[in-house]
Amino acid sequence: MKKSRDNYTFLTHAPVHRVIFTMAIPTIISMLSTSMYNLADTYFVGSINTQSVAAVGVSFAMMSVIQAVGFLYGHGSGNYISRMLGAKEVEKAKKMASTGFVLSFLTGLLIAILGQLFLTPLCILLGSTPTIQPYAERYLGIILLGAPFMTTSLTLNNQMRFQGNAMYAMKGIMSGVLLNLILAPLLILYFAMGITGA
């Protein structure tokens, strides 16, 4: 409770330039870290074969759609949450946090189900050729399974940021990226799982 009071005081009484700087730096680092996630996969997959790299490239568009859904619910609900917290309407803020989370999860689940059902046509739509099709289906199939969790994590991340907890949001994103940097080479190279390990 003390932390939320401190946030309220900081966001409403601190000089505007200081608030912007304090919120912007962790947000920028979070965005760069998200890009690092994709770059790490491409780097380690590059040691397998060119088809695998192409498959990861084909899947980037779908990953962007999944991320956009997370940002959609995160920014929409987060904006409302911040205004309600500013007005000290805590119950309304809590309701919106739950609503944003649930809608994000359900949309992610819908993407996962439809994506798995139409995996082959989806890969072709994204630009997959017959050569890279098996690799793209393997990689994108796993990405789609994680869609509900990706959307909800990004939604929660943005909700935290809108509450003035940009530092916690950054730590959450960075821990995921670091975990990926450790697990990707282990699964791809050491356990020889190939593109599935990415």
Where are the language model's segments positioned?
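Residue-level signal for short hydrophobic patches within transmembrane helices
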Residues: 13, 17-36, 40, 62-69, ...
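Small-residue-rich hydrophobic transmembrane alpha-helices
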Residues: 53-113, 150-169
